[in-house]
């Protein structure tokens, strides 16, 4: 089987069953003897779940099965039965965040340097078959404001939050980053043309993925007026690829 996008090749074993018009039959595709007077043989082919699991990732995989038919006794070739097989394979989309817990450094002046969070997006095929990505960043603190995400005081939840922004560009590119608004979806088209430069583990396999780094920047604050303590926040990344398969 050949992936039409990546040209990767994987060998899978096709199993099957045959039966003649005389109702005799058997398993496999070799040694089929007994066309009898009706001269008709029906072949049923299938791929087991075990074989399908050998595919390294999703996408469209093509193969051609050719059965040679011979006339009994003389063993002269009658012809070939050619079957084109196409598998449209898709796994569940997934997101990899290798370092999902980050710290935003704070100085005594209330300023902070940006921190990058690396993420990688697996569209369910790993072959770039999704032309459209929809992405959304949700702030789970419940205290987001405008285009700012919030960090809440762990021991004093009613204290004034610290705020930070999240910036990101088009996945898979080095384009300019823009500040995202919590809970607001963005749609990116032409994603089947961007480089698939990353890898991630999902479902026991290593699959290709599209890199999408996020930049977190803590907003300036007055340390004198800010309640002391540890501040925490959480972002939920929602990724919805659309799959275009022929």
Language-model segments: which ranges?
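N-terminal small/polar-rich segments of proteins
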Residues: 44-169, 212-234, 238-246
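Signature of Gram-negative chaperone-usher
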Residues: 1-46, 141-223
